[in-house]
Design a protein with these regions (language model features):
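Bacterial N-terminal signal peptides that target proteins for export
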Residues: 1-9
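C-terminal motif of bacterial Sec signal peptides marking the signal peptidase cleavage site
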Residues: 16-19
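Catalytic-loop region of hydrolases
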Residues: 22-124, 434-435, 440-450
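Conserved alpha/beta-hydrolase
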Residues: 121-141
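Alpha/beta-hydrolase active-site loop
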Residues: 148-169
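Alpha/beta-hydrolase fold nucleophile elbow
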Residues: 170-180
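Alpha/beta-hydrolase
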Residues: 179, 188-329
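C-terminal subdomain of alpha/beta-hydrolase-fold enzymes, centered on the catalytic histidine
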Residues: 278, 282-450
Length: 450
């Protein structure tokens, strides 16, 4: 009841402020202190801090924003048990105007600043509200270590609560958006709360439906890049798998042990080897860059060992570990094409069914048995076809995650395929997104947001 009363108060308070704001895309800097005042008046936000993203302070005029803040919002650990355990969730706000559109950036990981979806928000001259995912960054809850409530349903309820708290303040239209797992989070939010947003957008977001999703292997080995770069990629993998557990793997274990790190199982080594090449395509926009990197790995043993040691997953890295937990519970995991190298894996201890367990701590190995694909299967087979909330799904051809794009969409969802670029939501860089693709994205978004 307290939250409802405060929200009504804020609605009345903001009404007067918004009446003085502009109808065009320009920012009226006379309102510079108003947002903090309104946020403090709600009593819903804690530890409000100015200018959390120092990287954009000098670009304030260029980015055309008034203020930026970080703060914390009190959430229920279990939204089905209101009044039980609570945790503080970090929220970032880039403010451009009370009557401007608002982009709710549905962070799938920890919040590092106003980075994801910044081009889209800038082009819209929209506010950005970034919500850090539960059990990432500074938003850990009492469920940590039990993981019972680390689900897409609970994360969607987090977003719904933040939206309800801020909607009386930001009066323009709202959309949610994110890249990669953050985009998955947007679609899941629209799935659970289809009436909240005018549009949900996902950039480069995969929708895996098993712990061994085999759609990825053929796409990575046969579709991305050029034949030359794919041949180099396969040669690098073959070299790293030569002699099985007595080859590069043995050297990697020796080096990691000498550095005081835990030696990986052979299964974990194989997963990370494939993931290394996966990332080469994911983040390098040009085939020339990929060829240079893979040639270096192939020709320089020391460089190869360094690459391999650097990418072995550390189970003690908190934020990444939360991701593996979510994969084990609902998100699923890619199979990057182990069958293409069966001749080198035969007779080794590699077991594709042990990939997820190798990424989890021993005390959490039970999570694999809890895997449930119900939500994502329903999203792909039903929600994408019948969604009442308009959707936009943006993919890049050479991004391996595109392998897990939705197989079909209904009339209220739009697919945009970028033939160039990388695993990113960049719209304003011509090297990553052509003017035609950029315009297609903006035309579709503006149809719902203006």
């Amino acid at each position: 009841m307290k939250k409802i009363v405060l929200k009504l108060y804020v609605l009345l308070l903001v009404a007067g402020i918004v009446a003085c704001s502009n109808d065009d895309n320009t920012v009226d800097n006379s309102q510079n202190s108003e947002l903090r005042t309104v946020l403090e008046q709600t009593g819903l936000f804690y530890d409000i801090t100015e200018n959390p993203d120092t990287s954009i302070i000098k670009r304030k005029a260029e980015l055309n924003y008034k203020e930026q803040y970080s703060m914390f919002y009190k959430q229920d650990t279990n939204h089905d048990d209101v009044g039980g355990d609570e945790f503080m969730q970090r929220v970032g706000i880039l403010f451009r105007g009370f009557d401007r559109p608002t982009v709710l950036v549905t962070e799938g990981y920890n919040w590092r600043g106003f980075l994801d979806i910044k081009d889209l928000a800038t082009n819209l001259n929209a506010n950005m509200v970034c919500v850090e995912h539960r059990n990432y960054g500074m938003s850990y809850n009492q469920d940590k270590g039990k993981w019972e409530y680390q689900t897409v349903a609970q994360a969607s309820a987090d977003l719904h609560a933040v939206y309800q708290a801020l909607k009386p303040i930001f009066k323009g239209k709202w959309m949610c958006a994110g890249t990669s797992k953050s985009g998955e989070t947007s679609i899941c939010y629209a799935y659970y709360y289809p009436q909240d947003m005018q549009l949900a957008a996902a950039f480069c977001s995969p929708f895996a439906i098993s712990l061994d999703d085999e759609r990825f292997g053929p796409y990575l080995m046969e579709e991305v890049g050029t034949e030359e770069s794919r041949s180099l990629m396969k040669a690098v993998i073959r070299r790293a798998l030569e002699n099985g557990e007595n080859g590069y793997y043995k050297d990697v274990c020796r080096l990691m042990k000498s550095d005081g790190k835990e030696e990986p199982t052979f299964t974990k080594y194989v997963f990370n080897l494939f993931d290394l090449l996966f990332q080469v395509y994911q983040y390098m926009p040009s085939d020339e860059e990929r060829i240079v990197k893979m040639t270096t790995m192939q020709d320089d043993k020391d460089a190869m060992l360094k690459y391999l040691c650097d990418i072995i997953v550390d189970n003690d890295e908190e934020d990444l570990y939360s991701y593996w937990v979510e994969c084990a519970k609902e998100l699923g995991l890619q199979n990057d094409g182990y069958a293409y190298f069966a001749d080198l894996l035969e007779g080794t201890s590699f077991d594709k069914d042990m990939v997820i367990p190798s990424l989890l701590k021993a005390e959490d190995s039970w999570l694999v048995e809890s895997y449930d694909s119900t939500v994502f299967t329903d999203i792909l087979n039903n929600f994408m076809m019948t969604t009442p909330c308009p959707l936009m799904l943006y993919y890049v051809h050479n991004d391996p995650w595109t392998a897990a794009m939705p197989p079909k969409l209904g009339p209220n969802a739009k697919l945009i395929m970028n033939p160039v670029g990388k695993h990113h939501s960049a719209l304003n860089d011509p090297a990553l997104c052509s003017p035609a693709i950029r315009q297609e994205v903006m035309d579709y978004v503006q149809k719902y947001i203006y």
